[in-house]
Design a protein with these regions (language model features):
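Flexible, solvent-exposed loop/hinge segments and secondary-structure transition points
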Residues: 2-183
Length: 183
C-alpha cells in the first residue's frame, strides 16, 4: 500500500472518530439538559419546603411576612415578621467550606429563639456538626454579640471546626443586629 493511501485512510479514520465522539457528547449534553429541565421545579420546591420548615423550627408562627432589610450587612438574605412572636432572619455567613445558609429566630426582646442550618458545605465530621442539636442549642437565649469562647464569648466551638463555629456565631450576631435595626 502506498504512503498516500495510508495517510488518506488514517485521516478518514480520525474524522470518523471525531464525529463519533462529537455525537456521543451531543447526546449526553441533550440528556443532561432534559433531566435538568424535568427536575428544576422539584428541586426548587424541595428547597422552598426546607426553608419553610427552618422558619417554623426557629420561631413558630401562623405566617411569615417578608420585610425589606435596608441595612448594610451583606450576610442578611431575608427578614420575616413571624406574626406577633418576633422575626426570622435568613443569613449566609462564610464558613470554612463556603457559605452557610441558616435561619435565626429572634423574639420581640431581641433574644435568639433558635437556629436552623438550611445548607452548608462544611467538612463532614467536623464543621458539618454545626447542624447537631447540642451545638445549635447553645445559641438559644443569646442576645447582643455572640462569639465562641476563644474570642471571649460563651459558645463552645466545635472540635476542629473553629472557623465554622465562628461563622455560625457571626450569623447569629448579624441576625440579632438586623432585627435591632428594624426597631
Amino acid at each position: 500500500m502506498s504512503e498516500a493511501v495510508k495517510t488518506k485512510k488514517s485521516t478518514n479514520e480520525m474524522v470518523r472518530l471525531v464525529v463519533t465522539l462529537f455525537a456521543i457528547s451531543a447526546i449526553c449534553a441533550l440528556l443532561l439538559g432534559m433531566v435538568n429541565a424535568i427536575t428544576v421545579d422539584r428541586i426548587a420546591q424541595a428547597q422552598q419546603e426546607k426553608t419553610e420548615a427552618a422558619k417554623r423550627e426557629v420561631l413558630a408562627a401562623d405566617s411569615y411576612e417578608p420585610l425589606v432589610y435596608t441595612g448594610s450587612d451583606t450576610t442578611v438574605v431575608a427578614v420575616y415578621q413571624a406574626g406577633d412572636a418576633g422575626y426570622v432572619v435568613e443569613v449566609t455567613p462564610s464558613g470554612f467550606g463556603g457559605l452557610i445558609d441558616m435561619m435565626v429566630g429572634v423574639d420581640n426582646e431581641g433574644v435568639c429563639t433558635g437556629i436552623s442550618i438550611i445548607d452548608m458545605s462544611e467538612t463532614a465530621g467536623l464543621g458539618a456538626n454545626a447542624s447537631k442539636d447540642e451545638f445549635r442549642a447553645q445559641f438559644v437565649g443569646k442576645s447582643g454579640t455572640v462569639a465562641v469562647t476563644k474570642d471571649g464569648g460563651d459558645i463552645d466551638a466545635l472540635t476542629g471546626a473553629t472557623i465554622t463555629s465562628r461563622a455560625v456565631s457571626n450569623g447569629v450576631t448579624s441576625a440579632l443586629e438586623a432585627v435591632a435595626e428594624l426597631g
